[in-house]
């Protein structure tokens, strides 16, 4: 795993965006695996800025997202579909038909997961997968204890994840979806390149476990030590325990 040090969140975001933009420039018809949440947002803002300056072209890019809440309509302001459109897709020239997320509105979990796996395979797999990192080392919604050999699957959100996400639902955890569809560890590990972003002291223990701890399902991100082309971009606080 290659580690790139950043001074702060802004620097981390720029360095991560540099890696993503290099992938798009090198292979204009690449497949990007994308993530949601607070950590990748700055990188998306930087990509939009470069697009507006004429430095990036997304017209041939295909995207597949890591995860989506189960049971939320696409148009719900807290769906990951909405997050991605608000932060990236509506601001660049990506083709609508080239945007893929798990279908959170499909009540048949097995069917939703099967169809998403088929989409990922049909586009030729993922060239670059962007990941955030949970404080407990989770990637996507793959929580501690998840089997490494899973592809897209339906998960029950842990109480800690529901608690962490209630801030997006007016502080009311009753409004937070209790399940989600997520790419599995197997799918993530099949990406040709993986880019992990982490910032802040709250992520320091997870970063240490992911980089130098034992490879174990109890820290899902630790499997990335086995990936042949994984880059971690993190700020000084997130790297403070290394």
Which positions does each model-derived feature cover?
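Short beta-strand segments
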Residues: 33-37, 65, 102-103, 130-133, ...
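ATP/nucleoside-binding phosphotransfer catalytic cores, i.e., glycine-rich phosphate-binding loops
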Residues: 183-186, 190-242
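N-terminal glycine-/serine-/threonine-rich phosphate-binding loop
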Residues: 1-32
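Class I SAM-dependent methyltransferase SAM-binding "motif I" and its flanking Rossmann-like core
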Residues: 140-185
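A glycine- and small-aliphatic-rich helix-loop capping segment at beta-alpha/alpha-beta transitions
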Residues: 46-57, 80-82, 144-153, 215
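Ligand-binding beta-strand-loop-alpha-helix segment within the catalytic cores
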Residues: 56-129
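Glycine-rich N-terminal segment of FAD-binding domains in flavoprotein oxidoreductases
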Residues: 26-52
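Glycine-rich phosphate-binding loop
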Residues: 124-148
């Amino acid at each position: 795993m290659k580690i790139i040090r950043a001074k702060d969140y802004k620097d981390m975001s720029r360095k991560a965006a540099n890696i993503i933009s290099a992938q798009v420039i090198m292979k204009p018809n690449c497949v990007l695996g994308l993530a949601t949440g607070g950590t990748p947002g700055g990188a998306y803002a930087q990509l939009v800025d470069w697009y507006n300056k004429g430095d990036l072209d997304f017209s041939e890019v295909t995207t597949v997202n890591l995860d989506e809440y189960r049971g939320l309509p696409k148009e719900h302001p807290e769906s990951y579909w909405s997050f991605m459109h608000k932060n990236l897709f509506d601001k660049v020239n990506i083709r609508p038909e080239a945007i893929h997320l798990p279908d959170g509105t499909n009540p048949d979990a097995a069917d939703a997961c099967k169809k998403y796996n088929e989409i990922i395979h049909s586009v030729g797999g993922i060239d670059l997968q962007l990941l955030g990192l949970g404080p407990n080392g989770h990637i996507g919604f793959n929580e501690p204890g998840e089997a490494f050999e899973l592809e897209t699957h339906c998960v029950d959100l842990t109480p800690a994840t529901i608690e962490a996400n209630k801030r997006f639902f007016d502080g009311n955890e009753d409004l937070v979806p209790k399940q989600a569809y997520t790419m599995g560890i197997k799918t993530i590990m099949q990406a040709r390149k993986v880019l992990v972003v982490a910032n802040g002291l709250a992520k320091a223990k997870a970063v240490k476990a992911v980089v130098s701890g034992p490879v174990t399902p109890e820290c899902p991100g630790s499997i990335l030590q086995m990936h042949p082309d994984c880059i971690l971009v993190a700020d000084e606080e997130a790297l403070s325990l290394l």
